């Protein structure tokens, strides 16, 4: 079964038609993958936010009365990291129903366009939060001799392990959001 298709500048070619059930099946598969990746992103962002938000460590200094404490809320970059992950996680939870609509109606175009836009905004927010936290984590591990900032990870090893681990979940969520944007763009491109 073939049909004349206009390619460019009035040229025509014989191209096979893709049966409608196959096209709908591919769209439905993309939508199912979209929902699955959103759930994975929710897990990654909430794990990162909880891991960073519950991080603190106290070390005694000479006596029990004098102690040094390291907690995430002492550093604005870590607070921003927790807030960014929480906002992205909330967005992902709220976007699940719209993604489920795409399973039922794979041809829904405008709602997919809305998801692409907000996915890109959330990717930017998550990247900003993770980048800000990564800079501080690097300073915690390596320090900066020129600025007289010493590495604290030799003393606060549990604190540093937790903040480093929370970055892994956030960067994984960034990769998943990039894949989500590409999937949505693929689904939109197939309709034209």
From Swiss-Prot:
Residues 51-79, 134-166 are extracellular. It holds the Pfam family CASP_dom. InterPro entries: CASP/CASPL, CASP_dom, CASPL. Residues 1-29, 101-112, 188-192 are cytoplasmic. It is found in: Cell membrane. It is a multi-pass membrane protein. It comes from the Eukaryota. GO terms for cellular component: plasma membrane. GO terms for biological process: cell wall organization. Glycans are attached at residue 56. The chain crosses the membrane at residues 30-50, 80-100, 113-133, 167-187. Its main location: membrane. Keywords: Cell membrane, Cell wall biogenesis/degradation, Glycoprotein, Membrane, Transmembrane, Transmembrane helix. Belongs to the Casparian strip membrane proteins (CASP) family. Regulates membrane-cell wall junctions and localized cell wall deposition. Required for establishment of the Casparian strip membrane domain (CSD) and the subsequent formation of Casparian strips, a cell wall modification of the root endodermis that determines an apoplastic barrier between the intraorganismal apoplasm and the extraorganismal apoplasm and prevents lateral diffusion. PANTHER family: CASP-LIKE PROTEIN, CASP-LIKE PROTEIN 1U1. Homodimer and heterodimers. This is Casparian strip membrane protein 4.
């Amino acid at each position: 079964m073939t049909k004349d298709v206009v390619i460019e500048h009035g040229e025509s070619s014989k191209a096979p038609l893709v049966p409608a059930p196959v096209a709908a099946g591919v769209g439905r598969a993309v939508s199912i993958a979209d929902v699955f990746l959103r759930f994975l992103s929710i897990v990654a962002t909430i794990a990162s936010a909880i891991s960073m938000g519950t991080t603190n460590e106290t070390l005694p200094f000479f006596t029990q009365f004098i102690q040094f404490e390291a907690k995430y809320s002492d550093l604005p970059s870590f607070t921003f990291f927790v807030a960014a992950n929480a906002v992205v996680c909330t967005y992902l939870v709220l976007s699940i129903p719209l993604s489920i609509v795409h399973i039922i109606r794979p041809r829904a175009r405008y709602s997919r366009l809305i998801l692409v836009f907000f996915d890109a905004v959330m990717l930017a927010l998550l990247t900003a939060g993770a980048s800000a936290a990564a800079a501080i984590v690097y300073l915690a591990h390596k320090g900066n001799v020129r600025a007289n900032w010493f590495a604290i990870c030799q003393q606060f090893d549990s604190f540093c392990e937790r903040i480093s681990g929370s970055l892994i979940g956030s960067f994984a969520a960034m990769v998943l959001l990039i894949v989500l944007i590409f999937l949505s763009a693929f689904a939109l491109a197939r309709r034209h």
